[in-house]
């Protein structure tokens, strides 16, 4: 274990996945066991399954002038705008499933049966800078929970609305959601947070929910 930790500290490898833990949260166990994740590890997947990912740049929702408020995030974040973008993004990612073409018929069938999407965020560290909240603070942790709780709730609300329009994902009746009294949803999964190493460069923001690794740096693409 010490060697694994030391190697991860030095170069970021190896990544560790506890597959039994992932399967305890498998929302469609009737469709099979989770065997692996996508390359970056944020999206657990069944055999022959794919998931469309998208990330919201949180820094775009900063509202200046509230950095010295007792709760700078209350008025310092455009929550209404964020809600609109979450609902739009869920609809867009669901559309991508229908527009996608896959190399194997089995992949196509699995993807369309579960209709998994993964909406996440980037620019979190930038937003904290804008709000004047230290990344390594209790306030920073609380804001992370607050934002992702909001996105998760609104994302599932958007998926439920799509289920009313287009029908739930085909495996919904065999999923864990009816037992929990949840849904129906259009998508088996809605959120996931990717590291966004490339997307954040395109968006000109910090990656995922990670802190900036330096105050000044140059990245060659």
Pin down the residues of each PLM region.
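Short solvent-exposed loop/turn micro-motifs enriched in small/polar/acidic residues
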Residues: 1, 37, 183-186
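Conserved, charged catalytic cores of large soluble enzymes
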Residues: 1-32, 66-72, 121-177
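A generic hydrophobic-helix recognition signal that picks specific residues
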Residues: 3-5, 40, 189-190
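Function-dense linear segments that define catalytic or interfacial modules
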Residues: 8-111, 116, 123-131, 205, ...
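Short beta-strand scaffold segments in enzyme catalytic cores
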Residues: 16, 191-192, 201
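Internal maturation/activation junctions in enzymes
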Residues: 85-108, 112, 133-196
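Catalytic phosphate/nucleotide-handling subdomain of diverse soluble enzymes
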Residues: 131, 143, 148-155, 200-221
